[in-house]
Every structure is written in C-alpha cells, then in structure tokens.
Amino acid sequence: MAFVLPAKGILQSEALKQYIYETSAYPGEHEQLKELREATTKKYGSLSGMSVPVDEGRFLSMLLKLMNAKRTLEVGVFTGYSLLSTALALPEDGQVTAIDKDRGAYEIGLPFIQKAGVEDKINFIQSEAPPILNEMLCNDKQPEFDFAFVDADKSSYKHYHEQLLKLVKIGGIIAYDNTLWYGLVAKEVDDEVPEPLRMVRTVIMEFNKLLSSDLRVEISQISIGDGVTLCRRLC
C-alpha cells in the first residue's frame, strides 16, 4: 500500500483549523490568493499542501508590513501563494527575488500574480538556490534584504542559513518553514514516526538545535502551519 502523508500542519483538530481559517484568514484573503489556492488544489491534489496555508500567508503578510520591508528574498516558490502574499504586502517600490528550479509550478500561479497587478515586483529565477545565492555574495554590489523566506529542501537549510546571514541585513529576518515537521519533532522514538518522514525529521531537529545555539540570531518558533522559525539577525 502506498504511503499517505498525514495532514500537513501541527494543528490536529480539523474543526479548530477551519474555525481559524473562517474567522480570521478567509475573510481578508485577497481574491487572487483565493483563486491561486483553489487552482493549486485542483492541479496538485494532496500535494497542494506544499503551499503555505492561508493563516500562515496572512501572518507573513502582516509581519512584512510591520517591518516596513521593501526588499525580500524567497527560496522555494511552488505555485507562488507565499510569493503573491509577499508581493501584495510590499509597497509599490518593493521587490521580491524568488528562486525555484520548477518553472512549471510557478506558471500555475503566474496568471493570478498578473491579475493582482504585482508581477513587476517579482524577479523569478529558475534555478537551484545555492549557486544564485553564491552569485549574489560574489557580486560587488551585494544585495541587502530586509526579509527572507525559506521553504525548500530541508537538507539544505543549514547551508542556506550561512548564505542568508550575509545577505539579510542586521535587524532583518530570515523565516524558515516546516520547522515542526508535522509535529513529529516531538516524538521520542523513531518507531513513532512514519519511515518516509524520518530522515527529514532528523534534519529538521538538528537544524532547530543549531538555530537555538546560534548567537548571531534571535529566534522565535511560531506554531502556525507546519511551524515557522523567525531568525532576527543580530550581527
């Protein structure tokens, strides 16, 4: 029998999740975000869970506005729900650089980005992230970002962290998605974890430990979606 992923996110009460969505997320969701979310579900089915949930999108949008962020970076795009949330939250002269090797998934979201009138705020780069980030670091006019959002291959999070600490300005924030990994980080023994999820669980737990001892950042782990860890760069 094929392995079926558990429900994404750490909130296991479906009724409570729907209450949160219906009272504080769906009512203010931009129409193009709603249409993108529905198109992603239609195209990818259960795999649409790779997209950030609507409440997490609202959280990130508010965070960007509170920060007065203007220049942001996104590593891992999928169909672009978080990317569109970001572009809508940025001011007219804001810019988000988005990196993903899968142009096809991005094309699903592109019509909704265009309808929302924010395509000019987005610089999409089809590539693996490490070489692009290295290229930025080697540039004489090295960019300085206010905010970075990472939702990509978990095994590379430690590597991305070192690169992003040089690209995000002091006082800026790096946000890492999926840092509670279906809530499985709290399981005490591997036998309680579905075998296909064990390796990434181990990687995430090691990464969380690394962040907790990294004196270069101040962290806050948010229990929204599948877990989001905010890292404020201190030095």
Swiss-Prot record:
| Cofactor: how and how many bound | Binds 1 divalent metal cation per subunit.
Which biological pathway?
Aromatic compound metabolism; phenylpropanoid biosynthesis
Enzymatic reactions:
(E)-caffeoyl-CoA + S-adenosyl-L-methionine = (E)-feruloyl-CoA + S-adenosyl-L-homocysteine + H(+)
Enzyme Commission number, as recorded: 2.1.1.104
Provide the alphabetized UniProt keywords: Lignin biosynthesis, Metal-binding, Methyltransferase, S-adenosyl-L-methionine, Transferase
Residue positions binding substrate: K8, D151
Cofactors required: a divalent metal cation
Q: Which family does it belong to?
A: Belongs to the class I-like SAM-binding methyltransferase superfamily. Cation-dependent O-methyltransferase family. CCoAMT subfamily.
Its recorded name reads Caffeoyl-CoA O-methyltransferase
Organism name: Populus kitakamiensis
